[in-house]
Design a protein with these regions (language model features):
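Positively charged n-region of N-terminal signal peptides that target proteins for export
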Residues: 1-4
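Conserved functional acidic sites
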Residues: 19-191
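C-terminal motif of bacterial Sec signal peptides marking the signal peptidase cleavage site
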Residues: 14-16
């Protein structure tokens, strides 16, 4: 028994000292978060947002009302799915792995519309009237409308919470014109 335990310890220690062919010690750090961490999709999870668009403000309640085979449907009819590549709705990946600044991906949402996404910041503090969080990620997406106009969407997500803020602007001739804003007012985790 003692010799088996000693042998196991030696194997573990030897593998911890393994080197790559270049001679350096190989250490792989697990990512702090994966995309699914930023979209809690359990039945009963609920959010309340202030939605501001074209000068009008309203409260928007959202709740996960159905989950089947990993596909979560919310009270607005949106469907989300977390998979090995990230979290997507029915048309696009909203967040892709790895969760690192500079991660980029494209979504073809129609024959004439391609959205370009980029994680622009990770491990950031973020806040809204619902609270303060650490480890937040900021994702920017761009969708070119024509030669001079581009819609820009910036989404801030907190781990275990979801979307904290989202702002859409119209980039026109170098100017950014605000279009809509979503701010988290209240978050209720699944029971």
């Amino acid at each position: 028994m003692k010799s088996t335990l000693l042998f196991s310890c030696v194997v573990v220690l030897a593998s911890a000292c393994a080197t790559t062919p270049g001679g350096t010690t190989k250490t792989e750090k697990a990512p702090a978060h994966v995309a699914a961490d930023y979209f809690p999709l359990k039945l009963g999870t609920a959010w309340e947002y202030e939605a501001a668009m074209l000068g009008e403000k309203r409260v928007l309640p959202v709740k996960i009302v159905k989950v089947f085979d990993g596909l979560a449907e919310d009270s607005t009819g949106a469907r989300l799915l977390a998979d090995a590549w990230g979290v997507r709705d029915e048309r696009r990946y909203l967040l892709r792995n790895p969760i690192e600044s500079g991660t980029k991906w494209n979504n073809v949402v129609s024959p004439s519309s391609v959205e370009g996404y980029e994680i622009v910041a990770v491990e950031q503090p973020c806040e809204s009237p619902a609270g303060k969080w650490e480890g937040c990620v900021i994702v920017e997406s761009k969708n070119r409308i024509d030669a001079s106009k581009t819609l820009v969407n910036e989404m801030t997500l907190a781990p275990g919470v979801g979307i904290v803020r989202m702002a859409t602007t119209l980039e026109d001739g170098g100017k950014r014109l605000p279009q809509s804003k979503l701010t988290l007012l209240k978050f209720t985790p699944a029971p």
